[in-house]
Amino acid sequence: MIPEFAIREWSEHVPWTESEQVEQDLLICRALTEIYKDEYLASHLAFRGGTALHKLFLSPQPRYSEDIDLVQINAEPIKETYDHIRDALAFLGEPKVKQKKHNNTLIFRLESESIPVVPIHLKVEINCKEHFSVLPMQRMPFSVVNKWYNGKCDVLTYQLDELVGTKLRALYQRRKGRDLYDLYKALTTSDINIDNVLACYQKYMEFVAVSYTHLRAHETSAHL
């Protein structure tokens, strides 16, 4: 999909040594730009997760991150959002869609231009449950400059303290070394307000606890 000369050019801007990682990174950056160039998506989805942390706040990017994590701002049907994402990311082909009650994922599958050819997956995951932010959201400029693609947008995202707070919560939800690494890099290389981080962490943990309580109550009533 991407000419080899464009991949070589992009390798000058990212620290990855494998050609397929450079290629996937460029695809991710274009995908992010196309999503937030769409007026509907730009007002309905917020960018969160490790890729948001690394692409918007930590420079140079310290860790390879291959997913785009988004949060649905308002509680509403997801179909129109799906349609807009499909249109915005048509250059990636048709995605496989995995739907869950509170989480929806579009998976795009491609093959690398590098030899030997390896599969490249780009996952766009939408959280359809946490329709809130603790701190005011913000828009941050993002751009891609490459012979294959040029584009820019304003990405709706969370403040750094809130992103770090959700990373802290992730440590209690899963056992992923990348969460601990992301916390370490953010705390040692950025200007972090620890009080804000802990306040955000507490709010998200309270939300998880309330959601779990409601789930258990629903399961109990279903068996009565």
What kind of region is each of these model predictions?
Residues 47-52:
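Glycine-rich beta-strand-to-loop/alpha-helix junction loops that act as flexible
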Residues 1-45, 56-63, 68, 72-216, ...:
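Structured mid-to-C-terminal alpha-helical surface segments
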Residues 224:
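Cytosolic catalytic cores of cyclic-nucleotide second-messenger enzymes
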